[in-house]
């Protein structure tokens, strides 16, 4: 979604968004029912890494990386199970919405849906916040908030270090 302001090569070389420390497990992506079905039809993908959840009439999935850590080091990172040597191996239909909108996050702040910016993305942090905010506000915010309202299980709780767009 941010392909007009972020270079694909920079993101592919970085991979920061595709690995998780224990403190960032809350950010592992959520897969919609449609993502799950698309993954199931692709024989080259392992669907067993997904924990399917049915809650409040919605079906979605997350993967659990907690057992993948090899040390007690808080800074140890574990990659997404769908991260290949050349980047993400998921097609657009298989890729979770969280990944599609990274480094943006849709969050619940005091009952209001807000679009926020992940403060740790090296690529987006090279850009002026005002520029990113204007781009997102004009081009993406409406679609993102509408999608989130229709898929409330994708909304994460607000964190104060995430600047609101």
What are these regions (language model features)?
Residues 1-165:
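Short loop/turn segments that flank or connect secondary-structure elements
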């Amino acid at each position: 979604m941010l392909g007009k302001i972020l270079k694909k090569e920079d993101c592919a070389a970085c991979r920061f968004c595709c690995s998780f420390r224990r403190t960032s497990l809350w950010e592992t992506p959520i897969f919609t029912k449609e993502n799950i079905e698309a993954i199931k039809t692709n024989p080259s993908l392992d669907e067993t890494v997904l924990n399917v959840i049915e809650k409040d009439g919605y079906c979605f999935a997350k993967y659990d990386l907690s057992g993948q850590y090899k040390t007690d080091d808080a800074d140890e990172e574990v990659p997404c199970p769908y991260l290949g040597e050349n980047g993400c191996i998921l097609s657009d239909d298989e890729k979770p919405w969280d990944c599609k909108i990274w480094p943006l996050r849709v969050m619940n702040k005091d009952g209001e849906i807000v679009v926020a910016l992940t403060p740790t993305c090296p690529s987006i942090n090279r850009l002026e916040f005002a520029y990113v905010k204007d781009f997102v506000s004009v081009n993406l915010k409406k679609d993102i908030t509408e999608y989130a309202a229709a898929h409330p299980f994708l909304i994460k709780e607000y964190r104060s270090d995430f600047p609101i767009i």
